[in-house]
Each structure stands twice: as structure tokens, then as C-alpha cells.
Amino acid sequence: MGVLEKIRDIEAEMARTQKNKATEYHLGLLKAKLARYRAELLEGSSGGASKAGAGFDVAKAGFGRAVLIGFPSVGKSTLLSKVTSTESAAAAYAFTTLVAVPGVLEIEGAKIQLLDLPGIIEGAASGRGRGRQVVAVAKTADLVCIMLDATKPDDQRRQLEHELEEIGIRLNRQPPDVVFKQKTAGGITINCTVPLTKTDERTVRGILQAYKIHNADVMIREDITADDLIDTILGNRKYVPCLYVYNKIDSISLEEVDRLAREPHTVVISCELDLNLEVLKKRIWQKMGFNRIYTKKRGAEPDLMDPLIIKKTEATMEAVCDSIHRGIKHKFKYAVVWGKSSKFNPQGQRVGLTHKVAQDDVVSIVTKV
């Protein structure tokens, strides 16, 4: 029996099994097996991925990468040509884009690579069409933009989320707060700092055994599910922010536009009428989580034309130094910062390498002679 057949059998058994406290352990083991077989399926295809055609090995460019993912003919190519200087072939029929087409989106002084990927079809993660390659490229992204047709049913969104989930991409989620450490002896030790309501210790041990893990320390700091534990054990999941972009709002009612616009992580646009494209750009910038930092030489005005772009999660003075030149931090003496992160704003504050900078701060770095 092949891997695909095993996956289908497990999915069928899970569909037949009622979800309750009595079946929790059994379902947990089935999920562990399913995740293992899906990983085997993807690893088995990775060797031939580079030979499958041109256009998928696209080098990263700019300060980050956002990918456009969606079913064929939702308007990804049109959007790319509208917001970047790149032309991606667009037509009124499906499967126009056959390779990954990169463009550069300029927002708030930052250049962000925007990739128009071939249209995903249902079953992509199982190898249909070129979908598995498409979703694998999405794993390299700093932001996923799922493009949807506002005139079509809501299940298109669920199908795309399912395909991305199967390939190991987790949208708008944080990694589970679980510390998992394998060891050579001593058995399984499980410590929980919170009550577990979505799984139990027996299921946790069963999942570990399903992966042939017999010696490990597990510290659980949040109320996790069996899926969260499996994600932690595998360690190859990608947690990515996601924007849901509904196109063709010029073809639906105002009430429907209002309903979609109120959904979380959602932007509504019309490529045909150029509606909300600037709003989309701003939301992409916000979702990617960048800080714009300006530099200032001693005795000179701040350089407002060429800002440094730094991820908010890494926005320390050390990261500012690395953005200029990696050798600067070794000669660093101190820095003066003006802006939101300064205690004395609008006056400057003298800070060290660990100081966290904020959006639109101005920094002046003093080095040792």
C-alpha cells in the first residue's frame, strides 16, 4: 500500500470516529500517523522538485517576501501588474500563470518581493497539478496573501487553508508554548503549568510512542491540542502571517462587501476598478511587521530618504548596527535615539545595543576610535 492510500485510510477512519473523551487517545494516535505519512510524502517529492520546471527556485529579494496564493483565475496576475512594475500574463481563463513570477512592491520606503504563484487546485498537497511546489514555495514567505474571488462561495477559503495546513503552514498562529527535549535515557517526563482540556497525558505519551520517542522531557505551558504537540515534535512547521484578499467586489452587493470587510485579517479590493489597492499595500506592510528607522550622522540632519527596514521582533540597536554593517557592533560605544523609544522624547536618549527601537525612530551611532 502506497503512502497516499495509507493517508486516505487514516482520514477515512478519522471521519468515521466520533470525537469524545473516550476516542481522544485513538484520534491522537491517528493524527500522529497521518502527520508522519504526510511528511514522508513531501520528503519523497522534494528530490524531484527542482527538476519539475523553471520558475520555482526564485531567489529572495528586498526586505521580505510575500506570496499570492489562490485558485486559478482569481486575479493574482492582474494584482501583481497593478501594484508592481512586473507583468504577469493574465487572461480570462484558468491556469494562465504556470511559473512563479516575482515583482517588487515598494511600501513605506521598503522593497518587498511579491510572488505571483500558479493557481492552486484542490488536492495540491497530495501532488495534484503543480500545487505541491506552489505550497512549498509559500513556506519561504514572510507573508501569505490568500487571494479569493468575492463572487464565489466561502468554501474556497477553507479549501486553501486546508491545503496549506496539510503542507505544514500555520496561518496567523504562534508556535505552541511547549518545550520538547529528547534525551538518551530516563524515560518520558511530562510537566504542565496549565490544566489540559483538549488532550491528556495518556494521549501525549501515546503520540510520543507513535514517533518512537521513549526518552524525552516535555514542558507544556499552554492548553494544547494533539495537533499542537505533533507540530512541536516534527519541528518543521512554518508559522506565517496571512492576509485574505477578496477580489472582484465590484460584482457583489454592498452588504456582502461589508460582511467580508469585517472578517479578521481581510482586505476587499477590485483590481478591475483599482479599488482599495493602496489600503492593501498598507496592510501588507503592517502584517509583515517592519519598523522603519532613520539614521543621523553627528552634526547633520537625519537621512529621511534611505531608512533602515528592520523586523519588529528583532528591532534592537544591535539589529540596527547589523543593517548598516556587521562590523559596527564590535566598535559600538553608544547610540543616541530620538523618537517613540526614547524615555525623554522628543529629546534624545543615550542607549546601548540591547535598546529596542520603535517605528520612525532616528538613531545616531557613536563608535570607538
At which residue positions do the language-model features occur?
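Conserved G1/Walker A P-loop phosphate-binding module
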Residues: 2-211
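C-terminal-of-GTPase-core extension/linker across diverse P-loop GTPases
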Residues: 16, 22-64, 69, 74, ...
